[in-house]
Amino acid sequence: EFEKEFNENPLTKHVILLHELKKTKYSKDIIKHLAELNIEKGSEVLAAKLATNVGRYDYSIQVSKKASYEKRFYNKFNYPIINTPRVLKGKSMPSQEIILAITRQESEFDPKANSYAGAKGMMQLMTYTAKLVAKQMDVTYSKRKLTSDPEYNINLGTYYFNSLLNDYAEVYPFAIAAYNAGPKRVRQWRRLNGDPSKNKIDYVNWIELIKFEETRNYVQRVLENMNVYKYMLSQKPVKLEKFFN
């Protein structure tokens, strides 16, 4: 049986050993190699499962994403599900699917992710944003914990996104764009391109008119992720009119 052969492969054992030594960053290429061993017999799924088991959701996503380009879909591994806070400081937080959608796009669930711009951890928080949000939440700010404590990072990121959603009256495309490009730019784009929340333009066209390619792509991908998660969490079809919220 191929699964037995896969599990007994010295490279699979090497990945598990690296996990035990807390050195999983060295297992990325091994997992990608294992994924290619025998696709017909399920090496991609087994490699994605292995990545998940050693806590590397990012490698699991990368293997699954590559497979999806060739019409092989492993949503369980391509869209990991972790707990997100429902209530923080007595306030209701945004739905699980939007926080998962942002986290997948920001870091592929890599708790140690660091961007060239200085954004940190699972939800890619800039240090000045994290400091501000920690103060609002009345918790101690710790730069180290942004990349060493996933729960700390997700709590701060969720609280921050919730404040953006409140600022934009629960209009998801605005809040998502602001999370990526900053609230100031979203105010500018609403002024220049029209405001879909006031029926001046529809959401699809408003997103297409976002000046920055990175932010435009970001909003599209997060909304896409959100709707996949919506389906995965509810197991019910997502209605088109609910696509943007």
Give a label for each model feature.
Residues 2-5, 14, 21, 26-245:
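Catalytic glycan-binding domains that act on GlcNAc-containing polysaccharides
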